């Protein structure tokens, strides 16, 4: 990044944002508040890592408003797709192996990420869908009109690839896609690259499997 201000927010319940009665374990975190749409943790995570993060960055570096971009990987990619359509301050986005896309498919596909905890919860209780239908990144992507680059994986045991491609296919604005190898499979040092000049970037990553 050249001449760019970056902010790396921590979603509530995770890492330095641990606490407030929200479990940090990925399998428990993704189920927190799922009984009611108004209480589901993903809504708060969207506010933390996109809207509030952008406000904090722009308060410190107001000149970044002319070029505010978003970079999200896995969990951050899905949260970005959920939240970006409702924030007009962003100019571009890069979503790498984005999660939370096409929940009807996600609930039918076994995996090793915390999405598996959601799938099992739905199988056991039948109560997840009423909330999840309001937190589908592929549905939200239908309203995302800024230019977006998506790096989706054809194989990903943690984030089902059909959900990743569903987000890309649903994008309403200019889009560009590429194939990605998930960082959790590519080894140390693997990362996405995005160029930013004279602007601000909100970056959201996680080393956990979501």
Where are these regions (language model features)?
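Short beta-strand/loop motif that positions the catalytic acidic residue
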Residues: 144, 150-152
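Short alpha-helix in the alpha/beta-hydrolase fold that links the catalytic acid
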Residues: 146, 160-169
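Gly/Ser-rich "nucleophile elbow"/oxyanion-hole loop immediately N-terminal to the catalytic nucleophile
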Residues: 29-74
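Acidic catalytic loop of the alpha/beta-hydrolase fold
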Residues: 154-159, 185
